Amino acid sequence: MADVAESQENAPAERAELTVPEMRQWLRNWVGKAVGKAPDSIDESVPMVELGLSSRDAVAMAADIEDLTGVTLSVAVAFAHPTIESLATRIIEGEPETDLAGDDAEDWSRTGPAERVDIAIVGLSTRFPGEMNTPEQTWQALLEGRDGITDLPDGRWSEFLEEPRLAARVAGARTRGGYLKDIKGFDSEFFAVAKTEADNIDPQQRMALELTWEALEHARIPASSLRGQAVGVYIGSSTNDYSFLAVSDPTVAHPYAITGTSSSIIANRVSYFYDFHGPSVTIDTACSSSLVAIHQGVQALRNGEADVVVAGGVNALITPMVTLGFDEIGAVLAPDGRIKSFSADADGYTRSEGGGMLVLKRVDDARRDGDAILAVIAGSAVNHDGRSNGLIAPNQDAQADVLRRAYKDAGIDPRTVDYIEAHGTGTILGDPIEAEALGRVVGRGRPADRPALLGAVKTNVGHLESAAGAASMAKVVLALQHDKLPPSINFAGPSPYIDFDAMRLKMITTPTDWPRYGGYALAGVSSFGFGGANAHVVVREVLPRDVVEKEPEPEPEPKAAAEPAEAPTLAGHALRFDEFGNIITDSAVAEEPEPELPGVTEEALRLKEAALEELAAQEVTAPLVPLAVSAFLTSRKKAAAAELADWMQSPEGQASSLESIGRSLSRRNHGRSRAVVLAHDHDEAIKGLRAVAAGKQAPNVFSVDGPVTTGPVWVLAGFGAQHRKMGKSLYLRNEVFAAWIEKVDALVQDELGYSVLELILDDAQDYGIETTQVTIFAIQIALGELLRHHGAKPAAVIGQSLGEAASAYFAGGLSLRDATRAICSRSHLMGEGEAMLFGEYIRLMALVEYSADEIREVFSDFPDLEVCVYAAPTQTVIGGPPEQVDAILARAEAEGKFARKFATKGASHTSQMDPLLGELTAELQGIKPTSPTCGIFSTVHEGRYIKPGGEPIHDVEYWKKGLRHSVYFTHGIRNAVDSGHTTFLELAPNPVALMQVALTTADAGLHDAQLIPTLARKQDEVSSMVSTMAQLYVYGHDLDIRTLFSRASGPQDYANIPPTRFKRKEHWLPAHFSGDGSTYMPGTHVALPDGRHVWEYAPRDGNVDLAALVRAAAAHVLPDAQLTAAEQRAVPGDGARLVTTMTRHPGGASVQVHARIDESFTLVYDALVSRAGSESVLPTAVGAATAIAVADGAPVAPETPAEDADAETLSDSLTTRYMPSGMTRWSPDSGETIAERLGLIVGSAMGYEPEDLPWEVPLIELGLDSLMAVRIKNRVEYDFDLPPIQLTAVRDANLYNVEKLIEYAVEHRDEVQQLHEHQKTQTAEEIARAQAELLHGKVGKTEPVDSEAGVALPSPQNGEQPNPTGPALNVDVPPRDAAERVTFATWAIVTGKSPGGIFNELPRLDDEAAAKIAQRLSERAEGPITAEDVLTSSNIEALADKVRTYLEAGQIDGFVRTLRARPEAGGKVPVFVFHPAGGSTVVYEPLLGRLPADTPMYGFERVEGSIEERAQQYVPKLIEMQGDGPYVLVGWSLGGVLAYACAIGLRRLGKDVRFVGLIDAVRAGEEIPQTKEEIRKRWDRYAAFAEKTFNVTIPAIPYEQLEELDDEGQVRFVLDAVSQSGVQIPAGIIEHQRTSYLDNRAIDTAQIQPYDGHVTLYMADRYHDDAIMFEPRYAVRQPDGGWGEYVSDLEVVPIGGEHIQAIDEPIIAKVGEHMSRALGQIEADRTSEVGKQ
């Protein structure tokens, strides 16, 4: 893009005396000839670029014009004067005179809405080339004049460079640029993104997430504090290059790529992750995107759409496409890769990637929130140049216009601007045009000695395109922060096309002070999009008015009293509010004028002054400083604590004050896993942080792994908390507490005439019954208000006796005045009454260790005693005559119980209070109870819960009852616990109620309640409150920990603590691009003369979906082809090219895939495809459940198994595990019947021996599930070469039905094909009717398969099958394991009747039938099963329990099962597998079938003990079997944890561990608490699980007896209780449940140790519902399965599906394929090692 230059700026034509019309005619002729049009057809008013004139034409035209006229022009004239009309005038008449002197009268003041407020920049983040990854790094680079431009990094664009022609183009292109070092890295765990999704997310989205976090952290705004707030997100982005990778092969493109590569999601993903509720917009205006985004953010703040804005831009150079395009255009990219803005040698720009983000607030809001304001945006504007001189050509008129608009918006004269951060692309066209526009607006009218300074950050970081404006803003903000303008580099001298002096511009080439022409530093920032969208932002330094609160405007003089006819008005403020926040109306003011309250008494002032003097004379001790550390995950919290401790030991950390460190930490994000270290100095802080990092307890350290889910209950205690000096220290040292003490003091003076403050300040005060109550009330109010000042609030309150008054206030039930009145009346009456007591009228109170039931029995011996307080489940406060109180105390002590007498003369809450009730009623007349605003657990109303918003309760009767009747404190606490509350905070000068709270919570089964005191006798009161609030914060309750620190006076008050560390891992899609098509599935295609088709495919990696390959190949030739059946013969080796051959036949084709390595070919896949758009429906047998056909578009019944992709069902292990070696497809000439082949297929799929299959029983009753049905369906289609079969035809039928179906299809292929074609237009109902007609009369009844029973088999009635779902308890549950399957089948075969379900009661058999069943079972189980065993078994499950012992015995030596023995002589490395929870290693048979046929496998069965104890037993046996190695250790579920533990044990002994495979051994996403409360919850879940699984009702579990038992004891206790209750669960299942429970607990409690080696985690998508039901914390999965923090080299292989599916087909095929490659590499390495020896 060229620019304009002129040797004679305003000189008219000299060589030819032409007129303007003549010049126009000449130009028309020239242009017409150049573009091939008749001159007369040329429109002089149309831009010449639209007529077809190119830049190259313009150069030639300029030379001809110079020859003709003598006027030297450059190409830029064509852009400044785009039409023939304009250009001719310019050539003949020259440029019009420009008045650079300016017009002093021009008004630049703001006009328009008052909302045009200034906007504060409070946070900044940068990610620029050259390792400018923080604002500090960026500033240092700018100040030093460094750049981040490099050659194309190794590996960049490697996906594209495999294509030779593309590689050649890249090699010859100008590819120097600004590249980020780690564009592929992303911390997916931190941002809670699964690996697969992270791989599919555009790096621009990842950058936006990280930059937002860093910007908020830089702003010291906790991201957590903005959740749900009106936070706007505006992000510029103009490319989505990553989509090229995501869809490079559309056949495997992941759905995550839809959102992952969408530009709109860049901003949306930020809003989603951070839970921002303001506008969320991605802006694309090309190179001005990020500055336009900032402008829109400013507007959103001004118009109220947002209260905080995150704005900026991102850019990533993922593909070479744009770079190649610009390079081939020419004159765009700089040959040396450096941008030379406004320089004489400017020759183009350099592409760069990166991003920057700003955090914006309204200035007033930033000042209110105590934010550090970095700079201020005074104004901004955007525009477009409209239909100018070409879509992508810059336009100086439009640029000048946007400048004017921006400075008008700011209300600033542009002549006072100090510095312009220019767009400055370094092109010979763009720079002169930009300079011209600046000269017209910013330079106009300036004195020559006050030029506008000019620079461009592009010279340092390159052109970040959509993020360019963010980079420019970052530079200006940093320059303002450091009060220095950094140099613009690569400047060789002024461009010859720019008159700097005339335009009053000056380039900065050295660090320069801000000139402050207008009295303060002022800058403008420009960005221009190549599509014509222009933006300019005006930025200034922070002024005193920005950070100093404005003086309040004086209140107007009160108006005179209104005339009667006038409406009443309020003097002063427009509105007034009462203490509840309600508007006070004029009438209310008139009716109830506020009485003037007394102030602080002179005596109190004297005492206060003396106390302050005493305090000042004391030795100053360091304050207790809270250091908050948190993270989403506990492991990250620990790592952050460790890093902070290390930093605090560094010189920088030691030089930073503890308060500055705590203040900085308080403004970090507050994650769910929190800790607070309370410290007086650095040493204490470091010790505490080390304890957090190690997960250990320590003094003044509070740490929890997750938040409490319910809010705190504020406990307002009663009598007993009083002591001398209570509240005094806090009053003297905390202004908030002091202010509220004085408020209550004024009200008490008004009520009683004496000062509470005097009592608090009097060190000799001995509190009486009256003064105790009033003073505790005052302290409670002040404590609560202090907590509320720091953001704390109760979820509910509970008062105890005198505490009811403060409770009523905090619940919103009474105003402070009325609450004070209540406590004053109560206490005064009690004080007066006690003073009059003597002799026989004296009553005492005592606490005794008796429960409510016990105290009633004891009271039979003490008739005059009464209950005052039900304090705890085993503690009661009683009152009565002294002799009876002394007697009950003696009795309790004699019984070994706790007993304590109170120092009182009266007994409140007893009949002794009766004389006071009348006076109390009179005293409290006029109080106004209101509806509570938070929950109340009322100890007056027997602990009942009062909901917020309910009817008012605090009337006079409430206070009478509260004084006279018993206090139900423990009832209220128990109700709170039962309502889910676990945190109890006592507001008192000394904790007196927490002990009773603890006793009650423990009795309720809550053994880890959070019991938090406020003040305590003989403890520093300020430190106590800091500790209280730290605990509230740690438990996740409302508490703004920032408020625990004084307001910062400047940056020096914040420590430069370590930032959040992202743990980035590579997330990248393995796309490949190739011109020969071989990397695009199915590969390069060749049609052969014999009608066959061949494809050659070069897969991008070893993980090839062979079914997808076949489908892709078939679709080339048969667009409607559907994969009918397939068989995988082998696993392709690494580096193999796949050759697919297709041979057509009527109705479809056969397809084979061979793996080719060099000239060697191996058949790996054999498949059959059919010509079908949807499945053909084969007829089912009459007498079977009708198979409902599902045509295209027809709805599928809910119970129909989902037919996902063929890819999952075609990777079938039938041929590799069960089918005889070398078996081919069925043929009628083979001599094998359809029934024989069908028996093999179904038996192998369902785990039955073919001879055990009862043919008359519906398959679903035999235990058929969706996966089995799909496997049978596909195998039948493949073996019998049939069109697709309906799944319901398999699922709902018995074997006779399926056999008849196959026979019919084999004999009537043409008819079936026609039926399929016809059904494409039919509904499901029509298909069903046609099917019935087709089969009418053609199929006979089913026949018995076995005559052993000696009776005829019954025929199904009315063609109906039994309901397979069996809703009744214990009814129609199908077989679940091998033992139950063989037992079920044997019973059905011998008796000729289906048992129905394993729990169904069996009919009585005769001895002959029982003997036949016993004989058959003995043969199958290879163990003695007797007829007595059969006759005494009530159901199949019970009989199967006896069979199971022998059936599973197998080849077991001790705890080692031989699954496949290795040959005696050598052989391959064996695979050692470990049992899953509650199961045996037989489950690994599907995996064995997926590994090479000569791979030995040994299973390690269950032993008792913890994970570590089991490994200690396994490791010696492993060494005995395998010596020094190499070892391959594999396990599913618990087996994975055992494999891992054995790997550690072997490595410690120096053994060679080559492979550790964890098959979905995924740890819980949250730490599982090991508490007594968790025991109760765990067994509740177990009961629900058992009832669901075994269809039984579990009796009530005696939790209280479980708490003292270990896991083994608990499970035995519970299972014994279940058995004794009459629930019939056989012993085998009981033992299975015992081992399952203990095994799962072993996983939960395992102490995972670090492993320095490679571990492969085969990870499913989720746990199955039963696992989550038993332990809900397994519902959450970390992206690394919870192993990342322990394993140095973790490989995660996603396998999909649920946990329970991971060990079976089809998912195990994926595991086997990957593991086979690993085993092959191990064998290759062994061979290599042997060769070297």
UniProtKB/Swiss-Prot annotation:
Made of a minimal module holding ketosynthase (KS), acyltransferase (AT), and C-terminal acyl carrier protein (C-ACP) domains, and additional N-terminal ACP (N-ACP) and C-terminal thioesterase-like domains. One of its GO terms (cellular component) is cytoplasm. The gene is pks13. 4'-phosphopantetheine is transferred from CoA to specific serines of apo-Pks13 by PptT. It comes from Mycobacterium tuberculosis (strain ATCC 25618 / H37Rv). This is Polyketide synthase Pks13. Its EC number is 2.3.1.-. Residues 17-95, 1232-1309 form the Carrier domain. The active site is at residues 287, 423, 463, 801, 1533.
